[in-house]
Curated annotation (Swiss-Prot):
Enzyme Commission number: 2.7.7.18
SUPFAM superfamilies, A to Z: Nucleotidylyl transferase (SSF52374)
NCBIfam families: cyt_tran_rel, nicotinate (nicotinamide) nucleotide adenylyltransferase, PRK00071.1-3
Gene (UniProt): nadD
A Pfam family reported for this protein in Swiss-Prot or TrEMBL: CTP_transf_like
Catalytic activity reported: nicotinate beta-D-ribonucleotide + ATP + H(+) = deamido-NAD(+) + diphosphate
Primary enzyme class: transferase
Cited InterPro entries: Cyt_trans-like, NadD/NMNAT, Rossmann-like_a/b/a_fold
Functional description taken from the UniProt entry: Catalyzes the reversible adenylation of nicotinate mononucleotide (NaMN) to nicotinic acid adenine dinucleotide (NaAD).
Family statement drawn from the similarity comment of this UniProt entry: Belongs to the NadD family.
Native organism: Clostridium botulinum (strain Okra / Type B1)
Pathway noted in the entry: Cofactor biosynthesis; NAD(+) biosynthesis; deamido-NAD(+) from nicotinate D-ribonucleotide: step 1/1
Name of the featured protein: Probable nicotinate-nucleotide adenylyltransferase
Domain of life: Bacteria
One GO term (biological process): NAD biosynthetic process
Amino acid sequence: MINKAILGGTFDPIHNAHINVAYEALERFNLEEVIFIPAGNPPHKINLKKTPAHIRYEMVKLAIEKETRFSISDFEIKSKSLSYTYRTLKHFKEKEPETNWYFITGEDCLSYLEHWKYIDEIFNICNFVIFSREGFKEKEEIIKKKKSILLKYRKEILFMDASILDISSTKIRNRIKEGKEVSFYMPDKVYKFILQNNLYK
């Protein structure tokens, strides 16, 4: 069976930690492909200011262009409706029903995961992978949440430690506003694109 993963996010901007997570997932889950999906209109971030979708899409495209096992999809940003994870996963599962799908997301989603739309169906469609920038060792709240989901949905959440790189898009945007250096946080072409388009000032 072919294994593929979907890595969703606003990618505002994409940075080295996103790339690191994708490479880690490739190896750990024996993936043939990781599909980056820039978010369109996620319901939990609907009131937050975001860089226009086509610009975020272009940054992701530049960041992954040299890796043949990475691809990008505009499925969410082309949609006029809210970007529900279930709808995205359903789309890819219907396209490739025989593929074993993984969905990769950040630890911050754990706090509201059980309130996601059609969460039962999501667990049926894919293997749920959560990564952390801070590591998972001895985190009591993580252990409790994992047990809770296992009992309620009879599904095991997979955890992946991405603590090697303590980077966030928010940190990058703030550093740019403050006039600080950020080139070491992202692929060179993404950094140049940000400069050329005067982003995050």
